[in-house]
């Protein structure tokens, strides 16, 4: 088991420089300006795994749409674990931290989307306690994208998607 520490980063975090080292200010500052948070795993005072959380719309280039969480939801996106540290349960542990924090903030649901062929991420999401409630089908024919959402499982509202700006 890896000796790691999990932290929550926002604009006022003393450890803010750690995420700048990983992704750079050009990407991070607009996220913090929107009030987003970063959940991260540290090993030897360096970020080795992270995921971002947003309460507002976030563009998803892969599907040419944006996820729009409801006012009582958060959306987790842009996850990454450095290859050397994969397989150490860092991803599920930061996902659990995000879920715990969402509960403290009285959010009803935390959304995360994983490509069906990403077995490792699907396993991590499951380990963290997420439940698959809906499937998004995406196809592209020539230059024409097509998306379809399955009906959500019982007692769940559908996820919301909007056009990219």
For each predicted feature, which ranges?
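Conserved acetyl-CoA-binding loop-helix of GNAT-fold acetyltransferases
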Residues: 78-81, 87-104, 109, 123-127
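Conserved active-site alpha-helix within GNAT-family acetyltransferase domains
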Residues: 116-134
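Conserved hydrophobic beta-strand within the GNAT/NAT acetyltransferase core sheet
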Residues: 110-114
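Residue-level recognition of the GNAT/N-acetyltransferase active site
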Residues: 82, 115
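Conserved N-terminal entry element of GNAT/NAT acetyltransferase domains
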Residues: 1-13
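Conserved catalytic-core motifs of GNAT/GCN5-like acyltransferases
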Residues: 131-145
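Conserved GNAT-fold acetyl-CoA-binding loop/helix
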Residues: 11-24
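Conserved acyl-donor/pantetheine-binding loop and adjacent beta-alpha core of acyl/acetyltransferases
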Residues: 26-30, 34-38, 42-74, 78
């Amino acid at each position: 088991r890896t000796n790691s520490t999990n932290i929550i980063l926002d604009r006022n975090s003393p450890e803010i420089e750690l995420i700048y080292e990983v992704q750079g200010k050009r990407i991070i500052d607009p996220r913090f300006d929107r009030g987003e948070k970063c959940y991260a795993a540290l090993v030897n005072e360096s970020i080795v795994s992270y995921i971002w959380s947003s309460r507002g719309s976030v563009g998803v280039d892969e599907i040419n749409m944006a996820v729009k969480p409801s006012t009582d939801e958060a959306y987790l996106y842009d996850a990454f674990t450095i290859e050397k540290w994969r397989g150490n349960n860092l991803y599920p542990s930061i996902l659990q931290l995000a879920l715990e924090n969402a509960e403290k903030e009285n959010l009803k649901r935390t959304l995360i989307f994983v490509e069906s062929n990403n077995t490792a991420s699907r396993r991590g999401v499951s380990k963290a306690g997420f439940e698959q409630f809906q499937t998004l089908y995406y196809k592209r024919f020539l230059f024409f994208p097509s998306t379809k959402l399955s009906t959500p499982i019982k007692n769940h509202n559908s996820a919301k998607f909007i056009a990219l700006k």
